[in-house]
Regions:
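Nucleotide-sugar donor phosphate/pyrophosphate-binding loop at the beta->alpha transition
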Residues: 118-120, 129-148, 158
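Short hydrophobic beta-strand element within catalytic cores of glycosyltransferases
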Residues: 289-292
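Conserved donor-binding/catalytic core segment of Leloir-type glycosyltransferases
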Residues: 195-230
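A charged, aromatic-enriched C-terminal amphipathic alpha-helix characteristic of glycosyltransferases
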Residues: 323-357
Length: 357
């Protein structure tokens, strides 16, 4: 994998010079899920269309679905064969991105292999680690499946260099780079604080409230002020009972979510299993510094200690991050755009145009 920093800007003229393409993105993750995969696919598709590319998104809303046993909000598509192949044949995409490893992803992968079509995959979630937290299955067993799934692709796209290294060590080697972005017009500092009546400083958590996000590490911190959690998930009821002093506000979206980011004095990111963490960019764009562990994701995003603090002692990181410059955070986040994200994707997609002709 060639090293490209995630905040490297891509010149507009290089975008405009590319041929118009028909691109299919296959994603088992879709609304009503609220996660980085859905936001990345959706925002990238918008940016690609703004560049005059045609984008088809194959997602569970077009299929019969059942809830995933461990994640009921994730819908697993049932009637994928032969419908996925027929939908691809109707659209005749120049490039195919398989964004997830679920039933839709498997159907698209197998169809491409059977027809000799080149395809690109995306690794966005450390499901082997998530599975290990719930059932006693060794990660190496789960990674055998991911090797099978990803290794036939032309390239396995990852958002960071550290994730590429992580996957190389687990037998997935053909990695490429697909960056991430943030809407700096939506995520920006807001004048009025919706949390103005709470004791300061306000330490903010934004994300899924579940075991794999390590939320307890945040709630157990002995820090001054107020802890506010934005999000929902299977661990929410228990954590609300165990930590009555914390404020749980549920899921927030759009401008209201941005106002919560802006109201915080620090975003605390306790996860050690994420592959990137879009919430890091969203908080920084709102002028809120970050405190996190020095792990995959944060070490790639928070390259400048003027915008966040990484420490194995999360309490030290939180205390040190409070008071960092909001302007520095905002300026740093402005380097990450969805237009650049679309550009990095385009540079890694294979061309099947001759196959359909």
């Amino acid at each position: 994998m060639s090293v490209i920093h995630t905040n490297e800007k891509i010149q507009p003229q290089s975008l405009d010079s590319w041929d118009q393409r028909k691109i299919t993105i296959v994603s088992d993750a879709w609304h009503p899920q609220v996660n980085g995969v859905v936001r990345t696919v959706e925002a990238t598709a918008v940016a690609l269309r703004e560049l005059d590319h045609q984008v088809q998104i194959l997602n569970p809303s077009e299929f019969l679905t059942v809830p995933c046993p461990m994640y009921p909000e994730i819908r697993l598509s049932l009637d994928v064969w032969p419908r996925v192949g027929k939908l691809l044949e109707e659209f005749c995409p120049d490039s195919i991105l398989i964004a997830t490893e679920g039933p839709l992803g498997i159907a698209a992968r197998n169809y491409c292999i059977s027809k000799g079509l080149k395809f690109t995959t995306n690794f966005n979630t450390k499901f082997p680690e998530y599975i290990r937290l719930r059932v006693p299955i060794p990660e190496r067993w789960s990674y055998k499946y991911f090797q099978w799934f990803h290794n036939p692709s032309e390239s396995v796209l990852v958002p960071t260099e550290s994730l590429a290294t992580y996957l190389h060590e687990r037998g997935i080697k053909n990695t490429g780079w697909w960056s991430r972005g943030v809407d700096i017009d939506l995520f920006r500092p807001y004048d009025e604080s919706i949390l103005q009546d709470l004791p300061r400083p306000i330490s903010l958590y934004v994300g899924r409230i579940s075991v794999e996000k390590n939320v307890n590490a945040f709630l157990d911190l002995d820090i001054p002020g107020t802890k506010v959690l934005v999000g929902n998930g299977p661990a929410m009821d228990k954590l609300k009972s165990d930590y009555p002093e914390a404020i749980f506000v549920g899921e927030k979206h759009g401008q209201e979510l941005a106002q919560y980011y802006s109201a915080g004095d620090v975003l605390v990111f306790p996860s050690t299993t994420d592959t990137f963490g879009l919430v890091l960019l969203e908080a920084l764009a709102c002028g809120t510094p970050v405190a996190a562990y020095p792990v995959c994701g944060p070490v790639d995003v928070i390259k400048d200690n003027h915008v966040g603090i990484l420490d194995n002692d999360l309490q030290k990181a939180v205390i040190a991050a409070i008071g960092l410059s909001s302007d520095d955070c905002r300026n740093y986040a402005s380097n990450f755009s969805w237009r650049n994200c679309a550009a990095s994707l385009l540079s890694n997609l294979s061309n099947n145009r001759s196959v359909w002709n």
